[in-house]
Each structure stands twice: as structure tokens, then as C-alpha cells.
A protein has these predicted regions:
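A glycine/proline-hinged amphipathic helix-loop "lid/cap" segment
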Residues: 1-65
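Short beta-strand-to-loop junctions in surface cap/lid or active-site-entrance loops
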Residues: 62-72, 230-235
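Short beta-strand element of the alpha/beta-hydrolase
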Residues: 73-82
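Short amphipathic alpha-helix adjacent to the substrate-entry channel of hydrolases
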Residues: 90-108
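Alpha/beta-hydrolase active-site loop
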Residues: 118-140
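Gly/Ser-rich "nucleophile elbow"/oxyanion-hole loop immediately N-terminal to the catalytic nucleophile
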Residues: 135-150, 170
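Gly/Ala-rich beta-loop-alpha elbow adjacent to hydrolase catalytic centers
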Residues: 152, 156, 160
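Alpha/beta hydrolase fold serine-hydrolase catalytic domain that processes acyl esters and thioesters
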Residues: 162-306
């Protein structure tokens, strides 16, 4: 199936910006180019606060969103996409606002350190550390300590899945759920969706390979399940999961496979496949009808309707 009309128009608008692929410029230039793209605003909320969370000797900037005050809320800790190289709390502000308002959850968006200046495991440690900090400081945040979820899109989905695995391994606390939006879960570039979507879209196979090279120290890192969650040996006892995938996306196949692996381990997992859309569509609420549908599905999952 070809891109639907709205997605095709969006792709043409992005191409008209004439921005070079991320793998052909420096990481700094890639960030500047990404930041220059128009951002879609999100809804107004009664509480939005920037904060720094101190983890040992590292200060991690975060932004906390609440859809209502004077109430103990559930929370989703959100990790933005961008191949571990680009992206920011500012760039994902609209997404976080829509998630918070639509679900009734607090959202804590994490500005983890970026590669290649900071390679694995530091960005991952930021994400796990912030999630654990939320658990330890739930009363201060007016958050339900037993109802903490994680989520993210693309590389943020990778980080969310990895945080879920480490939380399971450490057994200090349990997560309520994980929301994975076209997550990057493996470094196998021979999957059919990598070949079929090698070029022509926002995320291409060469760009994705470049992202992996920026994040990892050496090919040996790719054997670490916290880098490639698909390589985790046993998915039993993981929290309920929703995975959203796009058919015009190199990462499509691994999202479907991860869902199937979770089902095989008797984990409650929901997979929603969107056709006619490309990687990145989730952040286009107000532009793409299917982005609004994906946001609604995500919020319903968090609420417990899915």
C-alpha cells in the first residue's frame, strides 16, 4: 500500500525543506536541522514544570506535565525519539501534552544525554535512573507509586523497552505498562521492512545504521539486551504492552516480532498496525488523521480501555 494522501503531502513538505540526511552531516548539524523543522503545539495544561533530576553526579533535565492538580495521578515516563542523537524535551512537547490530556496521566519527559558525545550506557542509565527516581519520590510528585509506566517513540521506544527489562531484572519496583511507538529493538538490517523501506522516507536504512553507530561503542554492544531488547532471553513477567507500528518504516518488522515474542511469553501485548503512514507519524496530531487515532489508542491503553 502506498502512503495515504495526508502522509504523501507531509513527506513532500519535509522534502521541500531540502535538509540533508542525518548520516551525511555532523551530529550537531543533524540536531540543528531537526530543530529547524516546524513543531506542532500541544494543548494547554494547568501544570507544566521544567526540573532537573540529580542522579549521582549527573543532572538530567526533565519536564513534568499534569492534566489536573490536587490529585494523585498515574504517570508515564516518556523518552523522545531521534536515534539517540537528535531530539529533545522541547521537540516532544506537543506529544507529551496530548498524552497527558488524553490519558489523564502525568507525563515526565526526559532529556537524556545524546550520542555520540555520550554513548551507551549513559543515555540508558539516565532513563532508568529517572524512572527509579520517580518511584522513590512518588509522594513528592503526588504520583501513584504502583502505577508507573514507561514509553517512547523510535529510539525512545528502545530506551523504554530497555528500562522495562532492567526494572524487571533489578526487581526493586514494578512497572504498570510500556507504550512503544515504532520502537527500535534490534540491529538486524536484513528484515523485509528494512529492505522495502530502504530509502525515500524520513527514516531510511542508512540513517538508522548511522544512528546505531553513534550510540554504541563497538559491535559487541549489540549483544547487550539493554541495547537490543530483542535479544533478551526471557520475556516472561513483563508488564502489559502496546506497540504501534507504521507500514512504511524500516522498524516495522521488529515491532511486530517483539509483540509476538511477548505473546509467546504470556505477556499481555496489543499491536496496532497503521497503514499508509511512515516513521514519525505519531507526532503529527493535527496534521494526520491517523496520528490522532494512534494518540487516542495510546491514551486508551494507558487508561486501561485496550
Amino acid at each position: 500500500m502506498a502512503l495515504d494522501e495526508q502522509s504523501q503531502q507531509l513527506l513532500e513538505q519535509i522534502k521541500a525543506l531540502n535538509l540533508p540526511p542525518a548520516n551525511t552531516v555532523t551530529p550537531s548539524e543533524a540536531r540543528e536541522n531537526y530543530a529547524s523543522r516546524p513543531r506542532l503545539p500541544g494543548p494547554e495544561l494547568p501544570f507544566v514544570k521544567d526540573m532537573n533530576i540529580i542522579l549521582d553526579d549527573v543532572s538530567v533535565p526533565c519536564r513534568l506535565y499534569k492534566p489536573e492538580l490536587n490529585k494523585t495521578l498515574q504517570i508515564i515516563v516518556w523518552f523522545h525519539g531521534g536515534g539517540w542523537v537528535i531530539g529533545s524535551v522541547d521537540g516532544s512537547d506537543g506529544t507529551a501534552r496530548h498524552l497527558s490530556l488524553g490519558s489523564g496521566f502525568a507525563v515526565l519527559s526526559v532529556d537524556y544525554r545524546l550520542a555520540p558525545e555520550t554513548k551507551y550506557p549513559e543515555p540508558f542509565n539516565d532513563c532508568y535512573g529517572v524512572t527509579k527516581w520517580v518511584y522513590e519520590n512518588a509522594d513528592q510528585l503526588d504520583i501513584d507509586q504502583k502505577r508507573i509506566s514507561v514509553g517512547g517513540d523510535s529510539a525512545g521506544g528502545n530506551l523504554a523497552a530497555a528500562v522495562c527489562l532492567k526494572t524487571h531484572d533489578e526487581a526493586v519496583f514494578k512497572l504498570e505498562s510500556q507504550l512503544l511507538i515504532y520502537p527500535c529493538l534490534d540491529s538486524n538490517f536484513t528484515r523485509t521492512s528494512y529492505i522495502a523501506n530502504d530509502s525515500g522516507y524520513v527514516l531510511t536504512a542508512p540513517v538508522m545504521k548511522w544512528f546505531w553507530e553513534q550510540y554504541t561503542n563497538s559491535p559487541a554492544d549489540l549483544n547487550d539486551p539493554y541495547v537490543c531488547p530483542m535479544k533478551y532471553p526471557d520475556f516472561s513477567d513483563l508488564p502489559k504492552t502496546m506497540i504501534i507500528v507504521a507500514d512504511h518504516d524500516p522498524l516495522y518488522d521488529e515491532g511486530v516480532e517483539y509483540h509476538n515474542r511477548l505473546l509467546e511469553a504470556n505477556v499481555r501485548s496489543s499491536l496496532i498496525e497503521f497503514t499508509g503512514v511512515m516513521h514519525g507519524f505519531f507526532s503529527q496530531v493535527g496534521v494526520l488523521d491517523k496520528s490522532q487515532k494512534a494518540m487516542n489508542d495510546s491514551c486508551n491503553f494507558l487508561i486501561g480501555l485496550v
